Amino acid sequence: MKFISRFFYAFVVIIILFALLYLSSVYYLGIKAQDSINREIALLRESSLIEVTGYHYHRGWFRSEAEATVRLRPSVLKTIHIGRFPSVLKLILQRPVHLKTRIWHGPLAHHQLLRAYAATEVVFEQQAEREIIKFFAIGRPFHIQDTIHLSGAGKVDFTLGSVDYKELSGIQIRFAGLWGELSYQKDYKEYVWHLKVPKFFMRLAD
């Protein structure tokens, strides 16, 4: 009987120690996940194409949330001659975009041995979202997933839906969608792009 009692107590102690170890690892990886996401935002701030106008990160124990507000830089809009674009496309490109990210962190995030897994929802302002539906048939056609390994390296997968748009003025836009993958080393010291870019056709107004 004493043997059974000792075995039971030892089993309980092992379970408690395992639970504490797991909770500690989840908390620690939550800190490291925030470091990784903050680094990605810092890289966006350094971009010559995009400016970050707002950023907030809320860290939880098992899951965290981040939100960044970005927009194309005025110099980019000038370079692409935004004034010649269709009015709906001008509205979309000139307005800020909200990147709402949910981050799952821990040794078994997304059923894998990871630092974190992040899924980002690209949210346009309400007026722009209504116009986007005219192009993509859905209001949120852009999807991003970020898989961060324990080492800090990882990959970002993103997809953009297809477009088939026409106006009576003669404007036409056809685009078969976009798929891409960015594989990166820790702190983005090295990274490689893999893009699948289909044919793009656009006819502007005369």
Regions found by a protein language model. Name each.
Residues F8-V26:
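Hydrophobic membrane-insertion alpha-helices, especially the h-region
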Residues M1-R6:
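Positively charged n-region of N-terminal signal peptides that target proteins for export
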Residues Y9, Y27-D206:
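Glycine-rich, small/hydroxylated-residue low-complexity segments
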